[in-house]
Amino acid sequence: MIAEQGDLIEVCFDPTVGHEPRKRRPALVVSDGFFNNVLSSLTVVCPITSTSNGHPLHVEVAPGNAVEGCVCLEALRAIDLEDPHRGARHLGASLDEATMGRVLDGIGAIFGI
C-alpha cells in the first residue's frame, strides 16, 4: 500500500497493551510520503476514535471528511501497512488541510519542535 501524509486509512491496531487504542479502526497517516514509500517499510499513523472527550491531544475531525471522530495524537504509532494481519486499506480520501495542520502542530508540540 502506498500511503501519503493526510491519507485516511482503516487498519487493525491489535495487538496492543495497556491504554493503546485497539481493534480495527480508522487512522490518519502522519508521516511524509517519502518516508513511507522510500525510506522505511513503516508508516506513522494516529488512530481515530469515535469518542469526543475533550482530551487536549485529540484533534476533532472537521465535518465533511470521510470519517468522524478525533485524531488521537498521544497514540502516534509506526506500523507496517504491508503486514496482512493489519488488513490496511485506503478509505479513498485525505483529511482536509485545516485539520491536518492542527494535527501536525500538535505532533510538533509533543516533540517540542
Give the predicted meaning of each segment.
Residues M1-I113:
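Conserved functional hotspots at enzyme active or ligand-binding sites that engage polyanionic ligands
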